[in-house]
UniProtKB/Swiss-Prot annotation:
Superkingdom: Bacteria
Keywords: Cytoplasm, DNA-binding, Transcription, Transcription regulation
Pfam name, any one: TACO1_YebC_N
GO MF annotations, alphabetized: DNA binding
Location of this chain's protein in the cell: Cytoplasm
Entry's Gene Ontology cellular component terms: cytosol
Chief location bin: cytoplasm
Presence of the UniProt keyword Transcription in the record: yes
GO biological process, one term: regulation of DNA-templated transcription
Protein name, per record: Probable transcriptional regulatory protein Gura_1416
Family recorded in the similarity comment: Belongs to the TACO1 family.
PANTHER family from the UniProt entry: TRANSCRIPTIONAL REGULATORY PROTEIN YEBC-RELATED, TRANSLATIONAL ACTIVATOR OF CYTOCHROME C OXIDASE 1
Species for this entry: Geotalea uraniireducens (strain Rf4)
Taxonomic path: Bacteria, Pseudomonadati, Thermodesulfobacteriota, Desulfuromonadia, Geobacterales
Length: 247
């Protein structure tokens, strides 16, 4: 399994997604609001907004919530001002961790993030300490039922960098700039992804087991549970056998 999807697979197995739907909505509303503020309220001319709306629809967010978030971002409603930044550090076993936040109080957020690192046997580092271990890529995930050869041909012709046949899904990666163009081309050809986003993909993986694996999952859980944290990326790998021991 490719590393960037390890955490989402683990969350699915733990049944954590439904339990945290309220927090997911909060984070998505923030993302829609900021995307609309920075690039305007028309998703056709604002790729970041379009991606955020698609994610929200994928989580069954009501249309009214989406429209209110867009209106808030474009100045139609009063609201707080959010600042975006990324914190970096190391988790248990030296795993690299990137934490993307959107906050109205940087002092509060940096204190919270540092505390989570420390309590989970990790440590927060300086800016740039681990970001070089990740590549920013467009990622589209398709079900295994899709004809791989046809998708491969269409994706490469559309400008994708790679198409990989994973254990549970097919993944198409692109450079961030051409992500929306490749996605639109594939959708017009009849290939609709289950998920599509610009993400951070680790270049190498750190294998964890035992207490280190437990603490790493605790760190990821607590980071995602923080309202100011939008995304968490890490380069850890935990085997199926190790996961079974912890479940």
């Amino acid at each position: 399994m490719s590393g960037h999807n390890k955490w989402s697979t683990i969350k699915h197995k733990k049944g954590a997604a439904d339990a945290k739907r309220g927090k997911i909505f909060t984070k998505l509303i923030k993302e829609i609001t900021v995307a609309a503020k920075l690039g305007g309220g028309d998703p056709e001319g604002n790729p970041r907004l379009r991606t955020a709306i698609d994610k929200a629809k994928g989580e069954n967010m009501p249309k009214d919530n989406i429209e209110r978030a867009i209106k808030k971002g474009t100045g139609g409603m009063d609201g707080v001002v959010y600042e975006e930044t990324t914190y970096e550090g190391y988790g248990p076993g030296g795993a690299a961790v990137l934490v993307e936040v959107m906050t109205d109080n940087r002092n509060r957020t940096v204190s919270d993030v540092r505390s989570i690192f420390t309590k989970c046997n990790g440590n927060m580092g300086e800016s740039g300490c681990v970001s070089w271990m990740f590549d920013k890529k467009g990622l589209m995930v398709f079900p295994k039922s899709v004809d791989f050869d046809k998708l491969f041909e269409a994706a490469i012709e559309a400008g994708a960098e790679d198409v990989s046949d994973e254990e549970e899904q097919i993944e198409v990666t692109t450079d961030p700039v051409s992500f929306m163009e490749v996605r639109d081309t594939l959708e017009k050809a009849g290939f609709k992804p289950e998920s599509a986003e610009v993400t951070m993909i680790p270049q190498t993986m750190v294998k964890l087991e035992g207490k280190q694996a437990e603490n790493m999952l605790k760190l990821m859980d607590r980071m995602e549970d923080n309202d100011d944290v939008q995304n968490v990326y890490a380069n850890f790998d935990i085997s199926e056998e190790e996961m079974d021991k912890m479940m």
